[in-house]
Every structure is written in structure tokens, then in C-alpha cells.
A protein has these predicted regions:
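Short runs within selected transmembrane alpha-helices of multi-pass transporters and secretion channels
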Residues: 21, 25, 89-108, 116-124, ...
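Transmembrane helical elements of multi-pass membrane transporters/channels
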Residues: 89, 100, 123, 152-156, ...
Length: 394
């Protein structure tokens, strides 16, 4: 329970850093599509230097604020010390999180999405193996889980650097890694910060919902944590499809190929819808065995199954919203993605608060708040998408 209730804060920090890297990656994609190799090099080195400084400061702040942040989430006092220790170890390793996400985002921006995927798979395998070793063999508990997360990302950073040195000539910068171009810093910060805030807004909404769920008791917390882990895992492909759309569209936007931009958008949107439908079917049919992978208490499993089945009814909606956001990011309009995410989370949290704190509904009805949030997102995004198409921007 301590690890599970800490995950939203850990994910918030990781997604914030990932957002910075994603925003900078859009600039790399655009420059690469335009054939401006020198700008690509300066953009990469400037992002690396600025990101390193930011990550170290951000890491220190997160370590210092771990306890008050967990208290703000209404984490029970009996598990607070364990949760604090877990978070501090993870936060101390955020520099590795930055470099891993930065290098992976840069490779994707250059069109090498396969290598980024392979390194993600390696990181996941190392993390699982580390969990088994530190927790099951050494008996280190939550500290072992945290250490496994940090070490897996550190090892992946090393593997990324080795791979780049042998396989990615564009990124073999040598001393040029230390070139800092102040003229690029403003756009890097603008894109990176907007993207980071968009990612953070989504997670802040989840944390607020988690705090509301925490008022329902330990069983509800455990069931929600299990179902949320499934949610997070299933949303990853949707988000990665959108990221692939962003890279493809940004490269072609930089090269001035409007038709390719349009084709990339609608192809990605179709893939999102197909995946969303398949995901909905799987979670409806196999909710019980899926939830049983994470918890073994029958009462918690029953709650988690009901929650997941209700949530799965809305899975087509994030497929559409993720696809549209990927398109706007590829065109360089990150403000729309930030505004739509803020609307989504605002309506989701408000709906969750009304359902639980006012109407006193059970946990299994909570996903209705997700649907309300995604609907608000679509209502905001669709008119803007239609306008872009009418103005021949897409």
C-alpha cells in the first residue's frame, strides 16, 4: 500500500521530466525534417545542459518535500515513513530519469523509434528483475523497489550512450555536447515547459482523485491502486502512438510536406481507435484475472474488477483525445494540448469529488468522472481541429 500510494507522486515527477524532453524533441524533429543538422546539434546540447541543471534542482526539491506532499495526499500515518523512504530514493535518481527520457526522445525525434522502444523494454525487464532480487532475495521491501527503479534507468542511460556512440552519427557530438546556445534556450524552455505542464496536469488530476479515493478506506485504496496500474499500463501505447504521430508530423512540418502531415495524423488516429476498441474488449472480458495479478484479497479484487470494467467503457475517448493532442503537438501548438489537459483534469476531479464526497457513491462508479473529463476535452479540441482543417493547417 505504501508503494502504491506513493506511485502517483513518483509518476508526476517522471512525467514532468518526460514532458520537458518531449517538448524539446519536437524542436529536434522540426530541425531534422528541415535538414538543419547544425541546429539539431545545438538543440540537443542546449537541452542536455539545461535539463541536467533543472533535474538536479528538481530532484533536491522533491527529496525535501516528500513528507508534506504525501501528507497532502492524506496518506495514512501508519504507512507514511515507508512511503517517504521509497519516494526519496526514487527522487534522488531523477537525473537518470531525465537522461534516459532525453536520449530516448531525441532518438525518436530523429526517426529511430525502434531503439527507444527496445531500451524501454530493457528498462522494464531490469526493473522487474531488480524488484525480484532486492525484495524477494534480499528482503529490502519498498526501499528495494525504489532502488530497482533507479538502477534500471541508470543502466539504460549507459546503454543509450553506448548505442549512440556506435550507431547514431548525428548525436556523436564529442566536445559539442558542451555547446550552450542561449538563442535556443527560450524556445526550448517554452516547448519543454508547456509539454511538461501538460503531462504534470494529467498526473496532478490523478493525485487529486487518489486523495479523494483515500477517504473510502484501505480496501478502496488497494483496489484503486491495482486498477490504476492497469490503467497506466494500458494508456502507455495510446500515449506512445500519439508521440509517434508528433514526431512524424513535426518532421514533415519542418520539411514543408503538408500532405504527409495530414496523412500521418489520420493514420495515427485510426490506430488509436483500433487500439482503444481492443483494449475495451480485453478489460471487459478479462478484468478479474488482470486485477488478480496485482492483489490477492477477494474483497479488493471484486472492487477492482468493478472499477476496471466501468473504466473500460470509456477507453475509446482517450484514444481520440491522445491522437488529437499528438497532432497539435506535431504542428507546434502545445498550448491547445495544455488547455485541453487542464480541462480534462479539472472536470474529472470535480466530478470525482461530487460523486464520492457529495453523492457518496461506491468506488466502482468513480470511472464516470473519467468519462466526464474526456468529454470536456473532446468538446474543447474538436472545434479547434475543424478550424485547423478549414484553414489548411492540417
Amino acid at each position: 500500500a505504501a508503494v502504491g500510494t506513493s506511485n502517483p507522486l513518483m509518476t508526476l515527477a517522471i512525467l514532468f521530466i518526460n514532458g520537458l524532453c518531449l517538448g524539446a524533441g519536437i524542436l529536434v524533429s522540426t530541425a531534422y525534417g528541415a535538414g538543419d543538422t547544425q541546429r539539431v546539434e545545438r538543440q540537443v546540447s542546449t537541452t542536455a545542459i539545461a535539463g541536467t541543471v533543472f533535474s538536479l534542482v528538481f530532484s533536491a526539491l522533491c527529496v525535501l518535500l516528500a513528507t508534506p506532499l504525501l501528507r497532502l495526499m492524506q496518506v495514512p500515518e501508519e504507512i507514511l515513513p515507508i512511503a517517504v523512504q521509497y519516494l526519496r530514493i526514487v527522487f534522488a535518481g531523477l537525473i537518470f530519469t531525465f537522461f534516459y527520457n532525453f536520449l530516448a526522445a531525441t532518438m525518436r525525434a530523429l526517426g529511430d523509434s525502434k531503439s527507444a522502444l527496445y531500451f524501454l523494454m530493457i528498462s522494464s525487464v531490469l526493473n522487474i528483475g531488480g524488484d525480484l532480487f532486492f525484495v524477494e532475495v534480499l528482503g529490502w521491501g519498498s526501499e528495494g523497489c525504489a532502488l530497482s527503479t533507479v538502477l534500471s534507468e541508470a543502466l539504460c542511460c549507459v546503454l543509450c550512450v553506448v548505442y549512440i556512440q556506435f550507431k547514431v552519427p548525428v548525436l556523436q557530438l564529442g566536445r559539442r555536447w558542451f555547446v550552450f546556445d542561449g538563442s535556443l534556450l527560450r524556445s526550448t524552455v517554452q516547448y519543454g515547459w508547456t509539454s511538461a505542464m501538460q503531462q504534470a496536469t494529467v498526473q496532478l488530476g490523478k493525485i487529486a482523485v487518489q486523495a479523494i479515493v483515500n477517504t473510502l478506506g484501505i480496501n478502496a485504496m488497494a483496489a484503486f491502486t491495482a486498477a490504476s496500474r492497469v490503467d497506466d499500463f494500458t494508456y502507455m501505447p495510446q500515449q506512445n502512438i500519439a508521440h509517434a504521430m508528433t514526431t512524424l508530423m513535426a518532421q514533415n512540418h519542418g520539411a514543408g510536406k503538408k500532405e504527409r502531415v495530414r496523412q500521418g495524423f489520420f493514420c495515427g488516429l485510426r490506430i488509436e481507435l483500433i487500439y482503444g476498441f481492443c483494449l475495451m474488449a480485453v478489460c471487459l472480458l478479462f478484468a478479474r484475472p488482470i486485477i488478480s495479478l496485482f492483489v490477492d484479497d477477494p474483497a479488493v479484487i471484486d472492487l477492482g474488477v468493478k472499477f476496471l470494467r466501468c473504466a473500460s467503457l470509456f477507453y475509446l475517448m482517450p484514444g481520440v483525445t491522445n491522437g488529437i493532442q499528438g497532432g497539435f503537438r506535431g504542428l507546434g501548438d502545445l498550448k491547445i494540448t495544455l488547455n485541453s489537459s487542464m480541462l480534462n483534469m479539472g472536470f474529472r476531479v470535480a466530478a470525482a469529488a461530487v460523486l464520492v464526497l457529495v453523492l457518496k457513491v461506491d468506488l466502482q462508479i468513480m470511472p464516470v468522472s473519467y468519462g466526464i473529463g474526456w468529454l470536456s476535452m473532446l468538446v474543447y479540441e474538436l472545434p479547434l481541429l475543424i478550424r485547423y482543417m478549414k484553414e489548411d493547417k492540417l
